[in-house]
Amino acid sequence: MIEFKGLREGVRWVHPRDEMLLVVKRLAEFSARAGVTVRITSLNDHSHSKRSLHYEDLALDCQVLKRGGGVAMSTMDRLARYLTAELPGGCYDVVWRTPGHERHLHVEFDCRQR
């Protein structure tokens, strides 16, 4: 199951883009196969860095939580590997376990740097 629930406020998606709909589809596939709920915590909402792709509807943040709360780190590791393998190469970035991304996984579609 996919759940849309912001950490500080509601999740807002201004103009769903095909590139990110594919990410949501892959999240749903992982969720069904792993038997977990993937929570999308941010799309085009609250504050992000000035050049963030969240504002262009080309990025999302998500997490998988343990039953009692807290991030399910090993499941998040599996999710990061799954997305890296299943999203087409070239423009998708999966950011996990880097500074600022220790509690959520960030996925963006960014061809600017290539």
Where are these regions (language model features)?
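Extended, low-complexity, intrinsically disordered C-terminal regulatory tails
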Residues: 18-51
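Catalytic cores and adjacent binding grooves of peptidoglycan-active enzymes
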Residues: 5, 10-18, 49-58, 64-114
